[in-house]
Structures are given as structure tokens and as C-alpha cells.
Swiss-Prot record:
Membrane-related topology note: Peripheral membrane protein
Family of this protein: Belongs to the ATPase alpha/beta chains family.
Top-level lineage group: Eukaryota
InterPro entries xrefs: ATP_synth_asu-like_sf, ATP_synth_asu_C, ATP_synth_asu_C_sf, ATP_synth_F1_a_nt-bd_dom, ATP_synth_F1_asu, ATPase_a/bsu_AS, ATPase_F1/V1/A1_a/bsu_N, ATPase_F1/V1/A1_a/bsu_N_sf
Organism ancestry: Eukaryota, Fungi, Dikarya, Ascomycota, Saccharomycotina
Key words of the record: ATP synthesis, ATP-binding, CF(1), Hydrogen ion transport, Ion transport, Membrane, Mitochondrion, Mitochondrion inner membrane, Nucleotide-binding, Transit peptide, Transport
Name of this chain's protein: ATP synthase subunit alpha, mitochondrial
Function of the protein: Mitochondrial membrane ATP synthase (F(1)F(0) ATP synthase or Complex V) produces ATP from ADP in the presence of a proton gradient across the membrane which is generated by electron transport complexes of the respiratory chain. F-type ATP synthases consist of two structural domains, F(1) - containing the extramembraneous catalytic core, and F(0) - containing the membrane proton channel, linked together by a central stalk and a peripheral stalk.
Binding site for ATP: 171-178
Cellular component GO terms, alphabetical: mitochondrial inner membrane; proton-transporting ATP synthase complex
Subunit structure: F-type ATP synthases have 2 components, the catalytic core F(1) and the membrane-embedded component F(0), linked together by a central stalk and a peripheral stalk. The central stalk, also called rotor shaft, is often seen as part of F(1). The peripheral stalk is seen as part of F(0). F(0) contains the membrane channel next to the rotor. F-type ATP synthases form dimers but each monomer functions independently in ATP generation.
Alphabetized GO MF terms: ADP binding; ATP binding; proton-transporting ATP synthase activity, rotational mechanism
Gene: ATP1
Pfam families: ATP-synt_ab, ATP-synt_ab_C, ATP-synt_ab_N
Record localization: Mitochondrion inner membrane
Length: 510
């Protein structure tokens, strides 16, 4: 039989046993993993943890505390959950998820936490900002009045966008949604190469849940067109963890807000928010939050509204900067009345609706002119464009009305035939090649010629040729008209007469 411990030894044995036990009182700052799986870790401890705080696991993986429940904390992982073991120690970092900001970000590609992924060395940030900041209040804002030119005739003429506006780009897959946003970024080059800071527009592009090849191609396009120097790309691709896809738009928004809050102008493209909603749904269901419509959580509207509300035009007292947002939403089979599309349509100040059918007909950009609107942009439209584009909307609407009849009979009256032929020509006029955005001074004369009937006798297939030669003719002979549109942004009655006679002269020789 084993000898009993003498009473004097008992205390020393107990002491040696107790020394082996970790200090349980320290559960305020650290915790232990209870279970891990599907990118979610449930942790016991971390009593002082804040919501959305960054935490670090012993294995080096980082995570964000989303659910603070009695007895445990639900943490989403920013990396692979294979590294994290049950019983592993987790510690607080004491900071909410923040990202590097400043002009040093320009020309860089970063991940959802703001770490560079382009192999160009560390980022020279001027500071850090919390990713999920609140939007500016009502008083620091002012209404939108400056144009944000996309370089696409169909957009600048019919659904003009102003600086500080939020314009949704919505359509099925492969209808050219990213192309519209990308052309807008490329179009800013003509101002960003100059020295006028008030005209410059810094661009932030967020890729959420896209293929890596697509993002690489996009960065390459920006570099080839020398547009990367004023752009920032934030990438959370399809292979990355859902929490990163959920966070990326907020990260990018914080980066773009630096420009807005320093009296500069920025543009942010969220491509696309459907993927962010899907990632957020995944997180919410794994964290066992109750599902709502289409199994999205109840606060998926708030997810998008708090993000898009951060795009704003600031008042002069607050620096007069602006942040314009172009969120992208992908619909399934043209269904605009699904949950996420209706949510985002109601949050934004208008939408550009792209249709697969138009795209296959060769009308590109495939903008459905009837369903696309801009709720605040007309106040910001270039005046010269407003002068010529007003009747364009009307003609296209009349054309859509009678286009249905056109299939039936040849015995249409003259005015209907006239409406049809002009409508076809205007539709042709609004087509545009990708990566070739046009300045407003090139758009206005062409649209002027279209709406005033100068194209009515030109064969449809020759319209692109007409457009090219007409602009060249004006540049050579009537430079002052183009100069006036570029500098003043409006056409006086003398210049309108001049444009009219120039157009007549050119059409006669064409």
C-alpha cells in the first residue's frame, strides 16, 4: 500500500498541484476556444471584449467578435479555421477593426484588412480609420450639384450622376455592369492628369466575391490606361473567408472617406453588394441569428444602408469634399423585385438598369432607358448637355411606344415612321465601345445633331462613322464651340447658332 502523506507535506503537495492550474481570473482579456468550424469559433472568456473587436488566436489567425452571448463569444475568423484548435488561447487586441488610410494608398491593391497584396512593399499610411464609422449627419451635407462624368453618352445624357450621389448599377450577370463602372474610372483621367484639385476624382474599386483572374484583369486594364495612379483596389475574392467579403466594402469606404473628409472628391465602386449580402447571410446563419426573408438576416437592409449612407456631398463649412458611390447588384433572370435588389434600389438615388436582351442585340452599354433613373443628378448635369438632352428622353420614350407596332404593318403613317427612324438612329447613337469614354464636349454636338433631326437621312450603319468624322471636323474648324463646352459647360445662343450652321455644313458634305 502507498504511504499516506504526512500532514506537513499535504500543503506543499496541494501547492504544487495548484501551481499547474492556469490563472482563471484572467478570463477578462483572454479566452479559450470551445468549438471551431465553418469559419466560426466559439470562445469561453474574453469578458471585456467589445462588439466587432479584432481578436488574435495563439496560432496567429485573426478574428472579429460578432456575437457577445452569456458565457461565450462568437468569433468569425479572417483566415482558415484549420489552424485553430479547440482549447487554444485567444487574446483581445483592444481595437475595433481598422484600416490604413491616406494618399499613400493610391495605386495600390489591398485586401479586406488594408494589407498590400500587390508585392510593391509596405503602404505609407497617414493614419488608421475604423472600418465601420457612422455616416455624416444632416447638417454637414449639402445637395448634389457638381457633375460626375462617366464618359458614357447614355449615362451622361439620360441618367446624369452628381458628386455625392449613390447610383445603383443593376442587371443580370454578363450585362456589362463592371464595364460601366470601369469606364467611369478611366474617364477621370482627363481631369486627374491636370492640376485643378476641385476637378480631380480619386477612385476606389472593391471586388467582393469575384474570381481572382477577373480582378487581375481589371488591375491590368487600369494600369494599361494609366489610371492606376489615382485608383485604389480593395479585393476580397471568392476564395477568401466570408468575414473578409463582408468587411471589404466597409474597409474601402473608410479609405475613400479620407478624400471626402479632406475636401477632395472620391468615387467608390462596390462590385458587388449581392455577394456581400450572401457572405453576411452565411455568417449570420452560422452564428445562429434568426433568418428572415430569403434566409437573409433581419438587418441586411441596415448592412447596405449604413454603407451607402456614407457617400455624401459635404457642405463648404466641412471642406466641400464628396464621395460618390456606384454600388453594383447582380439580379437573377432580370428579377429586380427580389429582396436585395429592392432594398438597394430604395437606398440609392437612382439606378442604371442593364438588360441581357439589349446586350445580345448589340446595344452596349445595354442600358434600359425607360427603367433607369437618376433622382438627383439632373441638378448636377453639365448645362450644355441639359440643353440638348431634354428632347432625347422624349424622343426615345415615343420610340418605345411605337416600336411595338412596327413589327405588324408596313402601312404606318408618316409621323410614326419618322418617330421610328429617329428612335433607331438615337439608339444607335448611344452605343459606345468599351474603354473609350468621351468628354462632354464630344458628346454634346453629336447628341445635338441626333435630336435636331440631322441624322434622319443618314443610314444607320454609317452613324458611328458620322460621329467620328463630325467630332474631328469640329475639332479642326470649330474649336471654340468645344472649348466653350469644356470650360463654361453651357452653350450661349450665339454658340448654338454656330453649332447649328456647322452641323448643317458637315451633314451636307457627309
Amino acid at each position: 500500500a502507498t504511504a499516506k502523506a504526512a500532514p506537513t507535506e499535504v500543503s506543499s503537495i496541494l501547492e504544487s498541484k495548484i501551481r499547474g492550474v492556469s490563472d482563471e481570473a484572467n478570463l477578462d482579456e483572454t479566452g479559450r476556444v470551445l468549438s471551431v468550424g465553418d469559419g466560426i469559433a466559439r470562445v469561453f472568456g474574453l469578458n471585456n471584449c467589445q462588439a466587432e473587436e479584432l481578436v488574435e488566436f495563439a496560432s496567429g489567425v485573426k478574428g472579429m467578435a460578432l456575437n457577445l452571448e452569456p458565457g461565450q463569444v462568437g468569433i468569425v475568423l479572417f483566415g482558415s479555421d484549420r489552424e485553430v484548435k479547440e482549447g487554444e488561447i485567444v487574446k483581445r487586441t483592444g481595437k475595433i477593426v481598422d484600416v490604413p488610410i491616406g494618399p499613400g494608398m493610391l495605386g495600390r491593391v489591398v485586401d479586406a484588412l488594408g494589407n498590400p497584396i500587390d508585392g510593391k512593399g509596405p503602404i505609407e499610411a497617414t493614419g488608421y480609420a475604423i472600418a465601420q464609422l457612422k455616416a455624416p449627419g444632416i447638417l454637414p451635407r449639402r445637395s448634389v450639384f457638381e457633375p460626375m462624368q462617366t464618359g458614357l453618352k447614355a449615362v451622361d445624357a439620360l441618367v446624369p450622376i452628381g458628386r455625392g450621389q449613390r447610383e445603383l448599377i443593376i442587371g443580370d450577370r454578363q450585362t456589362g455592369k463592371t464595364a460601366v463602372a470601369l469606364d467611369t474610372i478611366l474617364n477621370q483621367k482627363r481631369w486627374n492628369d491636370g492640376n485643378d484639385e476641385s476637378k480631380k476624382l480619386y477612385c476606389v474599386y472593391v471586388a467582393v466575391g469575384q474570381k481572382r483572374s477577373t480582378v487581375a484583369q481589371l488591375v491590368q486594364t487600369l494600369e494599361q490606361n494609366d489610371a492606376m495612379k489615382y485608383s485604389i483596389v480593395v479585393a476580397a475574392t471568392a476564395s477568401e473567408a466570408a468575414p473578409l467579403q463582408y468587411l471589404a466594402p466597409f474597409t474601402a469606404c473608410a479609405i475613400a472617406e479620407w478624400f471626402r473628409d479632406n475636401g477632395k472628391h472620391a468615387l467608390i465602386v462596390y462590385d458587388d453588394l449581392s455577394k456581400q449580402a450572401v457572405a453576411y447571410r452565411q455568417l449570420s446563419l452560422l452564428l445562429r441569428r434568426p433568418p428572415g426573408r430569403e434566409a437573409y438576416p433581419g438587418d441586411v437592409f441596415y448592412l447596405h444602408s449604413r454603407l451607402l449612407e456614407r457617400a455624401a456631398k459635404m457642405s463648404d463649412a466641412n471642406g466641400g469634399g464628396s464621395l460618390t458611390a456606384l454600388p453594383v447588384i447582380e439580379t437573377q433572370g432580370g428579377d429586380v423585385s427580389a429582396y436585395i435588389p429592392t432594398n438597394v434600389i430604395s437606398i440609392t438615388d437612382g439606378q442604371i438598369f442593364l438588360e441581357a436582351e439589349l446586350f445580345y442585340k448589340g446595344i452596349r452599354p445595354a442600358i434600359n432607358v425607360g427603367l433607369s433613373v437618376s433622382r438627383v443628378g439632373s441638378a448636377a448635369q453639365v448645362k450644355a448637355m441639359k440643353q440638348v438632352a431634354g428632347s432625347l428622353k422624349l424622343f426615345l420614350a415615343q420610340y418605345r411606344e411605337v416600336a411595338a407596332f412596327a413589327q405588324f404593318g408596313s402601312d404606318l403613317d408618316a409621323s410614326t415612321k419618322q418617330t421610328l427612324s429617329r428612335g433607331e438612329r438615337l439608339t444607335q447613337l448611344l452605343k459606345q465601345k468599351q474603354y473609350s469614354p468621351q468628354a462632354s464636349e464630344e458628346q454634346v454636338p453629336v447628341i445635338y445633331a441626333g435630336v435636331n433631326g440631322f441624322l434622319d437621312n443618314i443610314p444607320i450603319e454609317r452613324i458611328p462613322e458620322f460621329e467620328e468624322q463630325f467630332i474631328a471636323y469640329l475639332k479642326a474648324n470649330e474649336g471654340d464651340i468645344l472649348e466653350a463646352i469644356r470650360t463654361k459647360g453651357e452653350l450661349s445662343s450665339e454658340l448654338l447658332d454656330k453649332l447649328k450652321s456647322a452641323t448643317e455644313t458637315f451633314v451636307a458634305t457627309f
